[in-house]
C-alpha cells in the first residue's frame, strides 16, 4: 500500500517552492489592477487592416495619452515592418461614452489606421473601483469565516473539530496564494491585469478547494468510526487512497472543460479561465497532499518536535 502520509514533508516543501516565488513578486510588485479596481477605461477594437501596436501607442501619445497601456489580441502576423495585428486592447484614463474625448480619439484612429469595429468599451470611475476592491476583500473574508464555521459544525462529533476547519482554511489560502502569486508574475512580465472576474474566479477556487477537502475529511471521519484501534496516520492514509481517484477524475473533468474554454472561448474570459485552471489544479493537490496531512502533523505535534529539536542546536552554538 502506498504511504502518502510518510511523504508529507516533501509535499509541504513542494507547496512552499510553488508559493514563495509568487509571494515575493506579490510583495515587491503587487498585482496589476484592472479598471474594475483602479478606475479608467478599457477599449477593445478590431481594425479592418492590420496595424502595428507601436503605431497605435504613438497615435495615443500624440492625443495626450502617453501612459496608455496598449496590447494586441487575436492573430498576429510578421511583416517587413514588424509584427502586425488587427485586434487592439487599450487601457486609458476614464473616458465617458459619447464624450468629446472619445470622439477625438475615434477620429485620430480612423484617420491614421482606417475603419474599425468596437468590441468592448468599459469605463469605471475611481470611486467605483475602490468600492469594488473593498467589497471583494470583504467577500473573500466572509467566505473564509463561513467555511471555518461550517466545517467545525459539520465535524463537531469528532475530536478537535476546529482542526479540520483550520486545516481546510490553510489549504484554501494555499490555493489563493498560488493563483494570486502566478498572476503577480504574469502582471509584472506580461501585463496581465486582474478585474472583478478574477475575484469571481478566486471565490470559485475557494469553493472547489473546500468541497474537495471536505470529501476527504468526511472519509477520514467515517474510517475513524469503522477502523477503531488503528492509528490516526493509518486512517488518514487509507482515506486518501480511497478518495484519490475520485478527486483526480472530478478535477480532470473540470480541467478539460476549462481548457476548451481557454483555447476556444472569447479573449475577454481568458484570464478568468486561466485563474480557474490554476486554482483547480492547486485545489486538487492541496486537498489531497496538504489539508489531510496537516491534520496528521497537528495530531502528532510534528512542528513542536521540530522546534524542540532546533532549540538545543541553537543553544549549543
Curated annotation (Swiss-Prot):
| Subunit description | Forms a complex with SecD. Part of the essential Sec protein translocation apparatus which comprises SecA, SecYEG and auxiliary proteins SecDF. Other proteins may also be involved.
Topology class, membrane: Multi-pass membrane protein
Keyword Cell inner membrane found? no
Q: Where, by residue number, does the polypeptide cross the bilayer?
A: 11-31, 135-155, 166-186, 197-217, 244-266, 276-298
**What is this protein called in UniProt?**
Protein translocase subunit SecF
| GO CC annotation | plasma membrane
Q: Report disulfide bridges, numbered on this chain.
A: none
Q: Where in the cell is it found?
A: Cell membrane
In the record, biological process GO terms are: intracellular protein transmembrane transport; protein targeting; protein transport by the Sec complex
* Keyword annotations of the record: Cell membrane, Membrane, Protein transport, Translocation, Transmembrane, Transmembrane helix, Transport
Please give the superkingdom of this protein's source: Bacteria
An MF annotation (GO) of this entry? protein-transporting ATPase activity
Main function: Part of the Sec protein translocase complex. Interacts with the SecYEG preprotein conducting channel. SecDF uses the proton motive force (PMF) to complete protein translocation after the ATP-dependent function of SecA.
Similarity remark: Belongs to the SecD/SecF family. SecF subfamily.
Amino acid at each position: 500500500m502506498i504511504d502518502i502520509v510518510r511523504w508529507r514533508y516533501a509535499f509541504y516543501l513542494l507547496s512552499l517552492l510553488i508559493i514563495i516565488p509568487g509571494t515575493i513578486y506579490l510583495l515587491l510588485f503587487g498585482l496589476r489592477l484592472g479598471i474594475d479596481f483602479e478606475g479608467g477605461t478599457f477599449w477593445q477594437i478590431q481594425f479592418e487592416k492590420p496595424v502595428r501596436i507601436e503605431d497605435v501607442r504613438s497615435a495615443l501619445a500624440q492625443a495626450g495619452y502617453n501612459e496608455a497601456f496598449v496590447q494586441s489580441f487575436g492573430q498576429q502576423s510578421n511583416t517587413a515592418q514588424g509584427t502586425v495585428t488587427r485586434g487592439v486592447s487599450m487601457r486609458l484614463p476614464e473616458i465617458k461614452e459619447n464624450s468629446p474625448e472619445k470622439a477625438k480619439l475615434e477620429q485620430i484612429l480612423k484617420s491614421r489606421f482606417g475603419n474599425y469595429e468596437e468590441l468592448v468599451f468599459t469605463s469605471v470611475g475611481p470611486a467605483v473601483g475602490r468600492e469594488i476592491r473593498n467589497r471583494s476583500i470583504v467577500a473573500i473574508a466572509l467566505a473564509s469565516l463561513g467555511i471555518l464555521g461550517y466545517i467545525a459544525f459539520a465535524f463537531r462529533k469528532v475530536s478537535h473539530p476546529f482542526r479540520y476547519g483550520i486545516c481546510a482554511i490553510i489549504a484554501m489560502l494555499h490555493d489563493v496564494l498560488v493563483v494570486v502569486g502566478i498572476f503577480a508574475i504574469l502582471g509584472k512580465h506580461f501585463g496581465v491585469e486582474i478585474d472583478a472576474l478574477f475575484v469571481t474566479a478566486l471565490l470559485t477556487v475557494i469553493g472547489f478547494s473546500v468541497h474537495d477537502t471536505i470529501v476527504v475529511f468526511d472519509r477520514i471521519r467515517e474510517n475513524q468510526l469503522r477502523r477503531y484501534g488503528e492509528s490516526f496516520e493509518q486512517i488518514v492514509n487509507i482515506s486518501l487512497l480511497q478518495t484519490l481517484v475520485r478527486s483526480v477524475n472530478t478535477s480532470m473533468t473540470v480541467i478539460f472543460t476549462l481548457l476548451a474554454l481557454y483555447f476556444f472561448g472569447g479573449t475577454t474570459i481568458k484570464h478568468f479561465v486561466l485563474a480557474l485552471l490554476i486554482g483547480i489544479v492547486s485545489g486538487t493537490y492541496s486537498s489531497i497532499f496538504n489539508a489531510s496531512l496537516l491534520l496528521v502533523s497537528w495530531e502528532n505535534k510534528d512542528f513542536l518536535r521540530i522546534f524542540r529539536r532546533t532549540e538545543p542546536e541553537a543553544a549549543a552554538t
